[in-house]
């Protein structure tokens, strides 16, 4: 069918992450050594979904795609583990650390969970740290936003919220017959990462992403 398919990977359109990708790909951070991402929601988010889906399918898939998109390199393997110190309110995974090795050797740790209490002032905690051999970059969506430290100096780029950017991008692709920025293949890669992470939790062992 002659239709446009665009996967709703919203993080690709958040200005902070768009700037982060531009900085990474410009080489200002040098060769990327490691990346840490954190995406946390309050526990009531899990209650709202009532066990119909786990945190990796709900939140993790967005961060996994973000990491793949930022680095522009294919993931190779993952070792994932979930916390079992507190009895879960739902059967699916709800607090995980996922360590990926990408095919260029970059090490990535993604902390994905929804165990923040309702006392948390923001109800969510989203962070990203990128370490390169010539500089580093930090994103904290609860505070300053995006910070960069490198031989080019320290910068605090101006950012603004923009979820509408995603909708506009898709409309433009349809009207102007342009390639979509998040393809079905991108969706398949992110889903493979999620399924491998869940498999790793079940096996308590590293799993290749095929």
Annotate each predicted stretch with a short phrase:
Residues 15, 59-62, 165-166, 185, ...:
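A generic structural signal for residues located within well-ordered alpha-helices
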Residues 32, 78-79, 140, 181-183, ...:
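Short, hydrophobic secondary-structure boundary micro-motifs
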Residues 64-144, 168-180:
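Contiguous beta-strand/loop segments that form the cofactor/metal-binding neighborhood of enzyme cores
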Residues 103, 172-210:
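C-terminal helix-rich "cap/oligomerization" subdomain common to oxidoreductases
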Residues 107, 136, 153-155, 206:
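Short, mixed charged/polar active-site loops
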Residues 156-168:
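Active-site loop of classical SDR/Rossmann-like NAD(P)-dependent oxidoreductases
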